[in-house]
């Protein structure tokens, strides 16, 4: 589709951004997988674990399986002045949460320092199987202890207020201790993190400048490769050739090729709805690698998020399959924000199926949900990679509020799923108990190496 300037100005993207319009060229046509709402005979029980051990926690931006097969989560506190993030681990023996440490204490950057705080870990857990290390990097947004809010632009040159920088922590999951830490990104937060274990390299996207960084874990050195844009993608992924992939502001694939040592942009734009989108803001929100590592499944961070399957090892640029919208039908002439219209938590389970959480909300035309229930909810879907059929298997039930926004998902060594919740307090994580026929030991392997 070639979008003319006049057509774009009429669209919901707005006249102010008309010059951003780009042609929508994708690698494949949409597939016809039909959603199925009845989960059948297999029931998927859910459990809720609030962050009661960290009352200030207001978001959970990261959930990951560690190299030990256990589930780790970030209990973030970004709205309270002086708030800090705590590392949490699910304890399968007590069926509860263990609070391992407050990260500010590990990196000598206390919450009451007067600077912007080490308030969250944002899509930035990255495991290392060889030595049992779980890497994690912090993001910014938490205000100083005596300020109501924090602006990284306003405080960039203020040594008393400026965020010290993303703290990179190496946590030994065998010894339960932090073995070292470093400043990964001075003055900036880490939006997302990836670990190339073979080459001992960490890759990160910075905020607010949206630069692409490489950190050598052996030499403890960092390198700024360059700027991608203004809208951070929310994840990175790695292919068999050790190339790192993400997206730019306009929905193009961006890759870093170590052999060429440069950032490259695809000639096409990722799938989106051409009725009211042109690719702008169609950045990756979440990506999960298929078990054979030949393809990845991705969801975009935009109202009406799109699901897609990408084959990064094929051709000069990957083949991209458009799997269609992740969320329900709606009136495209009416705005809907990305907190309500959302898809996240992509994770492959031991049964070889893709699971993810997509929001659903009350709509008088497209989804007339009962008035007696919540006006929105988070639905756990199972997608069959062979047929691309989607099946609803569970709904996440928060005791006091809707739970439509899931940040990340993970599978533990027992084969059960965990999802991070973002909303109002109390926040925490959900556990989805897979039926015995779909669980297997060490279901987390091969392990996910990006946040």
Task: Report each predicted region and the residues it spans.
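Repeated scaffold domains used in trafficking and secretory/extracellular systems
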Residues: 58-61, 109-125, 188-194, 231-237, ...
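Loop/turn-rich, solvent-exposed surfaces of beta-rich toroidal or solenoidal domains
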Residues: 298-299, 334-382
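N-terminal export signals
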Residues: 7-28
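Surface loop/turn motifs at the tips and blade-to-blade linkers of beta-strand repeat domains
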Residues: 51-55, 102-104, 114-117, 182-186, ...
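Conserved beta-propeller blade signature
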Residues: 71-72, 134-135, 201-204, 243-245, ...
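Short, conserved, GDST-rich strand-edge loop motifs in beta-rich repeat architectures
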Residues: 76-82, 136-163, 358-375
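Beta-strand-rich domains and repeat architectures in extracellular enzymes and scaffolds
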Residues: 50-83
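Blade-level signature of beta-propeller repeat domains, shared across WD40, Kelch, NHL, RCC1
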Residues: 404-451
